[in-house]
């Protein structure tokens, strides 16, 4: 899968590539006039505001004035360099620059705007995972979005500087790209004069006032060379250090400006970003006003810390949107650096801390903060992060490090003014005087002996080989650092010239050392960094062991060991060469992380360059692998990746796997600081890795190494503790530092002992009264940057593999069973973290490891959007984070409803974890209990969809008003397809949506019972309505939402207008097209998303017609409540999950064969079928094999979904309302050219219609096809032939109206349903003794034969209710279009829903014609005047039955069925998958035969189930069916993401 993002960037770049070429830019060596440049740029349409970016810099230093710098005239290598240059992370990924303009919100970075066609999650995922490793690592390391990384890459090359404040990011990137691709070295541009005046708007801190402020103008090194050529005319040989030292014994400073800024071995540019442009070239992000003021107020104090970074690099789009807590930290970070750490810092060391901060122009402030180094004389130094060597590099590194002996010495930051040379007690006022004294009197006094005689020197007077070594060594004692960085804004100084050279690479961008590991393209500014990276990333060896007695630290490289010894054990605890070279490896020890290895000293050369030389590997690994934040001295200040400094004596809860890359063993237990947890938790697999670091190799490594449950539980425990400490509303909590909270069923955790404790696992340890508090805190932690599936904004279409179910609300992958060692028998998702986010690297097959127990409290997933919003607001208020995004329609909700919804959950908890959940997929193992009493697995709480009146709806489904359908409750069993009269289990009413007009059979149920499954928006809508109208549990209410609560996304409205003649019917907007609006022949309301909730809660699929007289018409209700996909907020990747609703076998085969109403084509004329002759049935040419799923038009009196249900083997469960089951015969041979369903394809006879169903004339609604497939609504067929209950009437068949394109001779042949369907496929209807009064309620199947399980039947298919005895079916459910059908003009498979009957007495033939398990062909007929309703039979609820609420298109999903013989039949929800947006690109053609033809009997991702239906191809514009290819799905993400974002 290749991202589509680079293409637009490339095209735009190429389109603009001629800009500079044609603009008379100077040749190398010439200097272009600023006016000429401006004119040239303006001539090409480049906004003038970009011109300030072309600073005319002042001369950099004397080298430029003397002309000793020779600039490489060749161009910056274009987008992708030669293979040998693949290691260069600089230009190779410029193609990923996001060039399209994005309007930036008032408070967000211009780069934070989402790509118009790519969801931000998707963008991060695609850009990072599918870009080169280098880009990914850099992106993750620096906390930048891919676009920011590209920006930084260019910045590293010194290709640009600050853009004017109002610069459009798109134009800015255009400029950068052009500059990168143009052959002229833009260093010349930087040489122009007047640079300071070009940015008058900038603060003086940002203005180029000093020549040294500018980075080297050299555009790029010779990328083809491993080591770049020296940029100085001097060669190595010409630089005589001995001569320099002897000539100027006091210092080498005089030679710095005249010497090379990098050696010949310097190579490519520095790991920290060559962009390290000084503040003059700041990042053009809009800066948070507060943070900006803080930075300006600390110009010089913190200037060094941000010397090469913009005042504040705003986080990437998802970082802003998803990381409220971290964002808060960032916005206050400068203050934290200076004040929060005040307990560890003093003013004297402020600059030192800053100078030791990561000197990276691309380092995210979080990382910078994390790496801030505190060096004080009185306090221990901050621990350094270990960086490692590969075993192969040990020898080379050893040689490198031993080049001079002084390297092995730990360096102390001191300022000595008194001489402690042996027998010398002189005192001086300044350090310079002391240095002069030592060099002249002591060192040069002993011409032949180079021995340090400083008192207490650890070398013990071991002589040096050369005098310069002694001179350098003495700097350890005096604290002299003569080698200062000459770049403006950088206050780095080093005692060793080599360290300075290494540091300068961070400014110049040289990275000559490329990782030698195959497939890794990372480059580093020094060999030590590369060795550390290789050992940390590609190896796990830690050969360097601290020899200090009692210390068991192990490190991957000597520099980390030195750092550790120096900072932890003190400067005098010298690391001897023996210690350094000891490579005997001891067994890794999991212990406390004594020193924060993340802020490692990257520069292998010398301790003082610890952070400067740090490379991109450090940024990644430091950000992602800091498992513990603990210093071995309580006085030490430890900053965290969350940009919050904290001093902690305990390690972070994030333990580390043995293979962690931190360079040392990380602690496995112990809480850390809130700041640490803030970022770490957000980068955990369950969370958005786009938060702290863009998804990248680093993120993958993080997940790989931190995926154990233990770490997650520790993390959440600590975060929970911190939140409880900081949030008063969370309830009092012990404030002791070492409080150990038991594991909670929180995001990313699995109660390991759940199987053994039977629901009383670790969570059970908590007092029951405390559990709600803890749960609420947990919910808050989840809410801080998570949205539940009900508000998911991400599509997982591109995760069409089996690991795609990362978005799945139930479990994230086929490995989901790993997440449920709990042994539950029903799927359920209590974790919002793994509900979606496919784009993050976390949405993998492993993400299911973050499963949770099914109970434990009113979890986040139990809340309505309003309640979640309320919690988010509380959380933000408690943590100081930004307020949550207001709900889309909350302001329109009535006050009463709003007040009711905003109440925090106060439900009684059924238990800590009442029952575990089981694998989501049938392939993960049987998860159905057939014998636990009523079919419930133990004490497992009923799911929301098990409540009779609740139902799920995808988050993307627009909120629609439900009809005030008052339906009786039905008893749901674990295996629900058979309906028996009975009462609901106490927990059946999960959501408490008692929508009844008659006494409730379970009025004692609590309305707010805990549900382990995330409430869909549909449920939330109903809950909101209930909250507005119900005063107590068990009360009956009308589900009709007030009109102003209906919220339709703008694009949906526009779409509807576009396809309905520009007018949006009010009835449609309300979800209720009036009967009179009956959709005309060509009227197509294509927006599946519009069609209403996925089974609005009131019309829960689980509610069988339990009202007296309703039962007779239930058509093959065989959905399993257990794996009820339609009840799940199915995400895109449900498609690939291959799950199917396992429908247990029917109680008994009915005596009658299951005849199907032949679905035949009729003229598009919509409602006039009074005279259809039942004998004109089209017979299927091949008949339907008994093993073949058949379309079952479930038209019951209230056929909420007369649906073509794929029922592989459904014993006829009775003769009542067999449901017009249209068998789709795959053998049907029909002309592909005709986009209509051939009568041959679907043929059969509605054989068994109960009297209550006799009125059900299956009227065709206009499918999205040019010729709509229609079921003949012949009243005579319905009534005349089905007069007798339970008598198979083969004559009942939908007749085929002549169609111009029918190419099948057998148009008039009468076909018995028995011919089409063998007796092996008896209808699942159970015969009822009462024609109209039998209550159908699900009963556990009597025979567990999987072969007879229903495949396509979904619980989503509402029970069919007769509004009145003789009335045609009233199915407002019909108002949903098949979501699998695109919303194109001819693309709606369903011509929109039948209008709910406003008059309960009116006959309403609104039958949704579903091809259930495969493609939902919704047949909806407004009113069919020709239908002759049978005289109404007395029914208890004839008048109270309202049309069922509009089910969302997701109700009946086309599911990828697995072998009907073997697997538990889960289903893939095509409806939900195709739920929103114009997915025309997602479908290869309406009901493309290629999709449905020759399908495997095994689960086939997006392909529909087995060969049950072959349909003619549709013209290109009418693509309706999903094609299982990744590319088409990716292209559809634009609409999907756009719509989802609008919905959320």
Swiss-Prot record:
C2H2-type Zn finger ranges: 417-444, 455-477, 483-507, 513-538, 544-569
Basic and acidic residues composition bias: residue spans: 569-585, 954-963
Sites bearing Phosphoserine, chain numbering: 145, 230, 232, 238, 385, 707, 997
GO MF annotation: an example: sequence-specific DNA binding
Biased composition (Low complexity): 637-657
InterPro entries, alphabetized: GLI-like, Znf-C2H2_ZIC1-5/GLI1-3-like, Znf_C2H2_sf, Znf_C2H2_type
Residue positions where Phosphothreonine is found in the record: 708
Disruption phenotype: Full embryonic lethality. Homozygous embryos are detected at the expected Mendelian rate up to about 18.5 dpc, but there are no live pups. Mutant embryos present important craniofacial defects, including defects of the medial portion of the frontal and parietal skull bones, absence of upper and/or lower incisors, often combined with a cleft palate. Besides, mutant embryos show defects in the ossification of skeletal bones and shortened limb bones.
Presence of the UniProt keyword Nucleotide-binding in the record: no
GO biological process: anatomical structure formation involved in morphogenesis; anterior/posterior pattern specification; axon guidance; branching morphogenesis of an epithelial tube; cell differentiation; cell population proliferation; cerebellar cortex morphogenesis; chondrocyte differentiation
Feature: compositional bias, Polar residues: 790-800, 805-814, 997-1009, 1173-1190, 1200-1209
Post-translational modification: Phosphorylated in vitro by ULK3. Phosphorylated by DYRK2; this inhibits GLI2 transcription factor activity and promotes proteasomal degradation of GLI2.
Pfam family, one: zf-C2H2
Cellular localisation: Nucleus; Cytoplasm; Cell projection, Cilium
GO CC terms in record: axoneme; centrosome; ciliary basal body; ciliary tip; cilium; cytoplasm; cytosol; GLI-SUFU complex
Keywords per UniProt: Acetylation, Activator, Cell projection, Cilium, Cytoplasm, Developmental protein, DNA-binding, Metal-binding, Nucleus, Phosphoprotein, Repeat, Repressor, Transcription, Transcription regulation, Zinc, Zinc-finger
The protein's assembly and partners: Interacts with ZIC1 and ZIC2. Interacts with STK36. Interacts with SUFU; this inhibits transcriptional activation mediated by GLI2. Interacts (via C-terminal internal region) with FOXC1 (via N-terminus); this interaction is direct and increases GLI2 DNA-binding and transcriptional activity through a smoothened (SMO)-independent Hedgehog (Hh) signaling pathway.
Family stated for the protein in its record: Belongs to the GLI C2H2-type zinc-finger protein family.
Domain notes: The N-terminal domain confers transcriptional repressor activity, while the C-terminal domain mediates transcriptional activation.
Free-text function comment from the UniProt entry: Functions as a transcription regulator in the hedgehog (Hh) pathway. Functions as a transcriptional activator. May also function as transcriptional repressor. Requires STK36 for full transcriptional activator activity. Binds to the DNA sequence 5'-GAACCACCCA-3' which is part of the TRE-2S regulatory element. Is involved in the smoothened (SHH) signaling pathway. Required for normal skeleton development.
Name of protein: Zinc finger protein GLI2
